[in-house]
Amino acid sequence: MNPPDLSMTTPAKTQADARSSYKAFRAITTRWMDNDVYGHVNNVVYYSWFDTAVNATLIEQGVLDIHAGSTIGLVVETQCFYFAPLAFPQTIDAGIRVARLGTSSVRYEVGLFAQGADLTAARGHFVHVYVDRINRRPVPLPSELKTFLETLT
């Protein structure tokens, strides 16, 4: 059996991004438990940071009500590229931008920087599809959410 051809799913060349290419930032403190046996932050933690950075920003801006809002965002796609290790104890700056704004979906890109660094240690994205909280069917982005997200493009 031949190995799968990943040439269609893996970019030919991926490079770290500059801090200046992100629109908003949020500080995240690493925890002792984030490190793995190899002495750096485990890959799963990066995905948690992406989610935390975006959702905390949306909540702070008053455009996402996780407890009672009629619209919620569900993650349908995610990916991460790693360029340099991060480890406890470190403060991470998570840069956020919107790469694509659709009718009911958003592609967020998050760059993770060692505090004060100009280039990303990791860069990832995830796509939220916004759905009705009850029936889980896609709905148009609420106007206040869309207005805020446009500032991140």
Model-derived regions, located:
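Generic structural "secondary-structure junction" signal
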Residues: 34, 40-43, 76-77, 84, ...
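HotDog/MaoC-like acyl-thioester-processing domains
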Residues: 2-24, 86-88, 98-153
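Hydrophobic beta-strand-centered segment that forms part of the acyl-chain substrate-binding groove
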Residues: 57-106, 120-124
